[in-house]
Amino acid sequence: MPDHAISTDPAVQAQLDRLWALSPGADVLGLERITRLLNRLGNPQDALPPVFHVAGTNGKGSTSAMIAAGLREAGHRVGLFTSPHLIEPTERIVVDGRAVSTEEFAEAFAAVHKAAERLIETGALDAHPTYFETVTLMAFWWFAKAEVDWAVIEVGLGGRLDATNIVAPQLCVITPVDYDHEAWLGKSLDSIAFEKAGILKTGVPAVLAPQHPVAREVIARSEERRVGKECR
């Protein structure tokens, strides 16, 4: 059994090995591939309950966790998707404060992997999804299966082209924006803020943390273009 094995069940470990083979660092921004895979999976994201979508640079993971904790305290069954993980990748997919088990994680991966293999066979997909795309798909699939009451989804990278930006949120949250992932999001604060603002949706309320004036102006302009009125 490989050094990174975390299951004594060979069938479960075989699924996990396939996931480990995907490079966590191979980020590819864009929604076309995940859209095709979601269609193949029956669009589990459409079965999700009300969604909080959280972007930003600083504090988005802790903000997501606090939102989920508050909803649980109010008596709701909550799905929480965050990244990266601290110890085990199962930590990324949480239902009611408990990370999914290794077996549940492998079950979700098997469903996503099967969908990807089928699309590749038919020529509808030219490559397997990235590690992050895969785990995002797994979270959507598992939350739909678990019938959660609320889902809290943390953006992985940026926002506008992030794999999570396929959900229809009931509330968008942008935590403080700062310089991060400059190779993908741009080297200026305004370009980074523009990408983060990409999670905002017409008619969906948004909560903005205190921002650097440059980031706040970019986000406000983005929302003004969306709603057709001044946002200050």
Question: Residues of each region from the PLM?
Answer:
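Hydrophobic positions on the alpha1 helix immediately C-terminal to the Walker A/P-loop
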Residues: 63-66
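ATP-dependent carboxylate-amine ligase catalytic core
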Residues: 7, 11, 25, 31, ...
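Acidic, Mg2+-coordinating active-site environments of NTP-dependent enzymes
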Residues: 119-123, 147-149, 154, 169-232
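Charged, amphipathic alpha-helical linker segments immediately N-terminal to NTP-binding catalytic cores
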Residues: 1-27
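Hydrophobic anchor at the beta1->P-loop junction of P-loop NTPases
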Residues: 52-54
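Pre-Walker A (Motif I) flank of P-loop NTPase domains
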Residues: 47-50, 204
